């Protein structure tokens, strides 16, 4: 078993069978590589993948960035560290994302994610990552 820590998602795709995506020191998604790349369930993973330049079609000339700033690791709150930057947090009632740390749960076979938002909403949003012509 080999562990590698990197921000180079191209390397991950080539050398790994499984990937753990981390944000603010916590695993937010853990799954086989193809599931993470084509069916991500954690909002941070979706943002990370959206920021990769595409070699297909015409680009806008600008990279897509995750809005906001990373949290201070010195003063993390009690909720999800990604909540202030998350497109799904506003859909979760009672400010749960900001106040309660989500658990890492198995949301599909051998695919774990840490998020309070409705799984179906996240799964629907993740379809934009499926390769053209169908899922891998």
Predicted features by range, described:
Residues 1-2:
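Short, small-residue-biased leader/transition segments that mark boundaries at the very start
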Residues 6-7:
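H-loop/switch region of ABC-family ATPase nucleotide-binding domains
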Residues 12-14:
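A short, surface-exposed alpha-helical micro-motif characterized by mixed small hydrophobic
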Residues 18, 30:
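Short, glycine/charged-rich "phosphate-handling" switch motifs in NTP-dependent
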Residues 32-136:
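Charged, flexible cofactor/metal-binding loops and thiol motifs
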């Amino acid at each position: 078993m080999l562990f590698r820590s990197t921000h180079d998602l191209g390397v991950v795709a080539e050398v790994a069978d499984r990937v753990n995506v981390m944000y603010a020191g916590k695993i937010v998604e853990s799954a086989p590589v193809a599931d993470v790349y084509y069916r991500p369930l954690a909002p941070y993973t979706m943002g990370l993948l959206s920021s990769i330049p595409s070699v297909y079609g015409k680009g806008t000339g600008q990279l897509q960035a995750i809005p906001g700033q990373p949290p201070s690791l010195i003063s993390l709150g009690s909720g999800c560290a990604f909540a202030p930057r998350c497109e799904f947090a506003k859909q979760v009632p009672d400010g749960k994302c900001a106040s309660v740390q989500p658990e890492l749960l198995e949301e599909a076979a051998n695919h774990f994610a840490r998020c309070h938002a409705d799984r179906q909403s996240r799964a629907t949003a993740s379809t934009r990552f499926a390769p053209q012509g169908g899922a891998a």
